[in-house]
């Protein structure tokens, strides 16, 4: 029952608010009034609860990515291996749940390299490399496993440019950039050939913009 997934989504939403409070507590020196404001407004932000129905890994993925940033901050302060390993683990979990979270992994890697300018440490380089590795390798491992189970090389799916093309479509019944099926029919029109679909996507973007 998909409604079970909606209920499960509630837990990471509460977790997101909890991590936000912990971040605030660290940044503002355990300021009680500030903490109360953050807790109050976090739960008052009702749109996050509307995403209960988005059972696509968005909510738990965001929760794990926030935990990754939290333990990154703790690692910068403590230099402990435990905090580094937890940061890496939560990055991997976030990206597995939602591939878009690789953006957060890239941000963590950039923060590590910026930190190197202040603190010369090979552990920071190791952290940056590990974060990027766990963001990329699990996806490749899953694809290899799927290929092995299928007994052949599976199609890589819709090219990402089709989603960009859909985002540039003039909106009708939905808001601009919302899902409207454009990526599906472009892929179908290309007979599910990723290369042909890429060219159709580029042409659609040109038509929409110019």
Regions found by a protein language model. Give the residues of each.
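Hydrophobic alpha-helical membrane-interfacial segments at the cytosolic entry of transmembrane helices
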Residues: 120-145
């Amino acid at each position: 029952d998909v409604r079970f997934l909606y209920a499960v989504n509630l837990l990471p939403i509460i977790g997101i608010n909890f991590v936000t409070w912990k971040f605030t507590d660290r940044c503002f020196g355990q300021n009680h009034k500030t903490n109360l404001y953050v807790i109050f407004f976090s739960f008052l932000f009702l749109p996050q609860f509307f995403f209960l129905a988005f059972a696509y890994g968005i909510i738990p993925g965001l929760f794990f990515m926030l935990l990754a940033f939290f333990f990154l901050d703790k690692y910068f302060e403590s230099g402990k291996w435990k905090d580094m390993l937890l940061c890496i683990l939560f990055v991997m979990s976030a990206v597995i749940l939602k591939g878009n979270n690789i953006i957060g992994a890239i941000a963590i890697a950039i923060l590590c390299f910026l930190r190197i300018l202040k603190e010369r440490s090979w552990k920071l380089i190791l952290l940056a490399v590990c974060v990027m590795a766990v963001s990329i390798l699990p996806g490749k491992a899953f694809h290899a496993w799927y290929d092995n189970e299928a007994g052949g090389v599976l199609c890589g799916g819709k090219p990402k440019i089709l989603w960009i093309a859909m985002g540039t479509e003039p909106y009708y019944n939905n808001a601009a950039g919302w899902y409207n099926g454009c990526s599906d029919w472009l892929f179908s029109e290309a007979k599910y050939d990723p290369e042909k679909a890429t060219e159709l996507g580029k042409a659609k973007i040109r038509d929409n913009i110019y």
